[in-house]
């Protein structure tokens, strides 16, 4: 079964397109966590609190790139899989072929075993081929990102009155030979989200609806292809318990935040 088939089943089963971003910023982890691997301990409780509402988990590799962090990430992915939830590794990789092949081993069962990965298309198709060729795995390619500086390059007009991100979208559609390609298109610029949807029928990963304040209605209206796609919130969910009196109250708030986002998005499905 392909990644997007697995994701479609999960979306139907949970009636949710919520992607929960697992970005355990060490500076924001609650003080009550007392464990050898605090990021793993935190993620475990987040998964326990949110898995009923999650279509997918999206750990960002930057929060795990040290020895203890990598162990925490391995445990996190295995635990999410144990709950029946697919995992999208947000790594934004992009490098020449030999290096890209090594990055792609993160998808192997004897690597991290992630179900999908994010990738950067700036260096061209050959840098993406190790992901594109994996029919059983998914790759979400950066297209129009949600950060404020995304327009610096992505919105440049590069020919035929098309912007760079529009060319990226069209090319990714051409590369979707194994039906395993999605696009990262942020919710902070809904008119651009719509313009990409007008060009392609790929599933989107739509970040920016949580702490970044993106447009939830546009994220659902334009982010799904045949009902398949993901709308991500990281900080808005996993740190929803900040200020709680105790551990149980903290993670009840986390679970409630995931449920609220699911309900908010489902109003537009």
UniProtKB/Swiss-Prot annotation:
The active site is at 92 (proton donor). Its EC number is 4.1.1.23. It catalyses: orotidine 5'-phosphate + H(+) = UMP + CO2. One of its GO terms (molecular function) is orotidine-5'-phosphate decarboxylase activity. It is an enzyme of class 4 (lyase). GO terms for biological process: 'de novo' pyrimidine nucleobase biosynthetic process; 'de novo' UMP biosynthetic process. Pathway: Pyrimidine metabolism; UMP biosynthesis via de novo pathway; UMP from orotate: step 2/2. Transmembrane segments: none annotated. The keyword Lyase applies. InterPro entries: Aldolase_TIM, OMPdecase_AS, OMPdecase_type-2, OMPdeCOase_dom, RibuloseP-bd_barrel. The keyword Lyase applies. Keywords: Decarboxylase, Lyase, Pyrimidine biosynthesis. It holds the Pfam family OMPdecase. Belongs to the OMP decarboxylase family. Type 2 subfamily. NCBIfam families: pyrF_sub2. HAMAP family: OMPdecase_type2. This is Orotidine 5'-phosphate decarboxylase. It comes from Natronomonas pharaonis (strain ATCC 35678 / DSM 2160 / CIP 103997 / JCM 8858 / NBRC 14720 / NCIMB 2260 / Gabara) (Halobacterium pharaonis). The gene is pyrF.
């Amino acid at each position: 079964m392909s990644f997007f088939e697995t994701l479609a089943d999960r979306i139907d089963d949970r009636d949710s397109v919520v992607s929960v971003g697992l970005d355990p910023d060490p500076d924001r982890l609650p003080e009550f966590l007392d464990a050898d691997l605090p990021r793993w301990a935190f993620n475990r409780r987040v998964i326990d609190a949110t898995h009923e509402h999650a279509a997918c988990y999206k750990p960002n590799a930057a929060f795990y790139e040290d020895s203890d962090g990598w162990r925490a990430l391995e445990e996190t992915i295995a635990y999410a899989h144990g709950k029946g939830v697919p995992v999208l590794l947000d790594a934004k990789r992009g490098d020449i072929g030999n290096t890209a092949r090594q990055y792609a081993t993160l998808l192997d069962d004897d690597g991290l075993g992630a179900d999908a990965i994010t990738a950067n298309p700036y260096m061209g198709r050959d840098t993406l081929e190790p992901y594109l060729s994996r029919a059983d795995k998914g790759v979400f390619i950066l297209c129009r990102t949600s950060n404020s500086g995304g327009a610096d390059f992505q919105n440049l007009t590069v020919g035929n009155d098309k912007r760079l991100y529009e060319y990226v979208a069209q090319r990714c559609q051409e590369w979707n030979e194994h039906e395993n390609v999605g696009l990262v298109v942020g919710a902070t610029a809904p008119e651009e989200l719509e313009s990409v949807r007008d060009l392609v029928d790929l599933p989107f990963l739509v970040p920016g609806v949580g702490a970044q304040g993106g447009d939830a209605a546009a994220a659902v209206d334009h982010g799904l292809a045949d009902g398949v796609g993901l709308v991500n919130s990281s900080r808005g969910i996993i740190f929803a318990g900040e200020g709680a009196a105790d551990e149980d109250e903290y993670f009840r708030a986390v679970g409630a935040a995931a449920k609220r986002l699911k309900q908010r998005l489902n109003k537009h499905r």
